[in-house]
């Protein structure tokens, strides 16, 4: 992982473009914020379930990774919900869905794929709309989440590639 001299933004980085074959359903910034909260809520619940499965399967370090990313998704939810509440007072966050973990290697791949989607498709699409609408707060929280999701994907792939290393 490389450190940078400046915080990446859509203005100074080249990996904020929206993919040509985007599968993200894009709405207004408010709709996108709500979609992000809903998606992150599901991801957080899924990662908590994956942590429990990893622990049960004897992968304690990977369980901690899933616990940490579940907690990180809660930070994204809080930031996004905070911007929603400024636009729509009284907004209530969605309830976390039921989630279940499966084999740890498959959970890592599914997690990485979800994070790659968010960092390469969903958040760039949402950032573009926030910029068009002039919503700097939404642009900031979407950008922060986008950058974090890239790190999560990298961590999941590293764990997947090293799942049978003797340290876990």
Predicted segments with their positions:
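Non-heme di-metal
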Residues: 2-168
């Amino acid at each position: 992982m490389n450190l940078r001299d400046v915080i990446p933004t859509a203005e100074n980085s080249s990996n904020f473009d929206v993919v040509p074959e985007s599968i993200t359903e894009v709405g207004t910034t408010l709709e996108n914020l709500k979609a992000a909260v809903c998606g992150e809520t599901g991801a957080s619940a899924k990662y908590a379930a994956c942590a429990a499965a990893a622990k049960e399967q004897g992968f304690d370090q990977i369980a901690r990774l899933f616990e940490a990313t579940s907690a990180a998704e809660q930070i994204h939810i809080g930031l996004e919900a905070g911007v929603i509440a400024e636009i729509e007072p009284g907004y209530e966050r969605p309830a976390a869905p039921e989630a279940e973990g499966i084999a740890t290697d498959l959970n890592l791949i599914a997690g990485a794929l979800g994070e790659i989607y968010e960092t390469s498709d969903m958040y760039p699409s949402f950032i573009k709309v926030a910029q068009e609408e002039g919503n700097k707060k939404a642009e900031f929280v979407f950008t922060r989440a986008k950058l974090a999701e890239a790190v999560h994907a990298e961590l999941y792939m590293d764990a997947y590639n090293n799942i049978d290393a003797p340290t876990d």
